[in-house]
Amino acid sequence: MRCNHTLCVVAITFLVSWSQTLSTPVESRRTESPLVRSVSATEERNIFSQTAEAVAKWGTTTALLNLGKTDDEVKKILGLEKLSGEALKAHSNYHLLDDFITKLRDRKVTGWLHKDTTTDEVWKTLQLDDLFAKLDAKEFRHSDELKTYVQYVKKLDDDIWNYKRASFEPDSSSPLELAVKIHIWAKAKRPSWHVLEMMGNNALKGSKNRKFYREYLLLIKGKKPIIDF
């Protein structure tokens, strides 16, 4: 309840501030021509409308996030639970769902980073092996779960690359997980020595997963197309 109250106060304060800003030039406009006043008033109305919409969107999705709602619960709240595909995207409330999912994904990724969560733990948490078995390749590639995993791998890899953090890469990555990772590394143009370090024992000669390192080399040499997850 306190969270909702705070959001309302912030939104109202912001809107009041804008309304005061929009009402300030009234005196100066009296000396302007009717055409100039008309254009100016229209522009101001557009700015106010866009700002009010942005504040409402931020307040709605942030409140739902802070209440601990899941994406399925938010779909129901927004009247989207029975829609899918293009029908879902065409609904006037879809932008709220999309914004909520993005914020939820960002929050999850940030939390995992703070806990130094390994990538295979994230993979298992998102149940991606099970999801892959249920969906076709295209559906899996565009799933929210895989997008969340890819975002985490990218952020963790950037952290390791830019700040020389210790690698948290475990040796228990599933073959499917490694198949996704090599494309992420290739897209980021990581050198082979970095990939060897990240793969750990998986890249050693004699390992059954060594094939993914060889696959990575083909990707960075342009002999195979890189999938942009």
UniProtKB/Swiss-Prot annotation:
The RxLR-dEER motif acts to carry the protein into the host cell cytoplasm through binding to cell surface phosphatidylinositol-3-phosphate. It comes from the Eukaryota. Residues 1-23 form the signal peptide. Its main location: secreted. GO terms for cellular component: extracellular region; host cell nucleus. The keyword Signal applies. A motif (RxLR-dEER) lies at residues 34-45. Belongs to the RxLR effector family. Induction: Expression is specifically induced early in the infection process, in contact with host tissue. Secreted effector that acts as a RNA silencing suppressor, probably by inhibiting the biogenesis of small RNAs in the host plant, to manipulate host immune responses and promote Phytophthora infection. This is Secreted RxLR effector protein PITG_22926. Disulfide bonds: none annotated. It comes from Phytophthora infestans (strain T30-4). Keywords: Host nucleus, Secreted, Signal, Virulence. The lineage of its organism: Eukaryota, Sar, Stramenopiles, Oomycota, Peronosporales. It is found in: Secreted; Host nucleus.
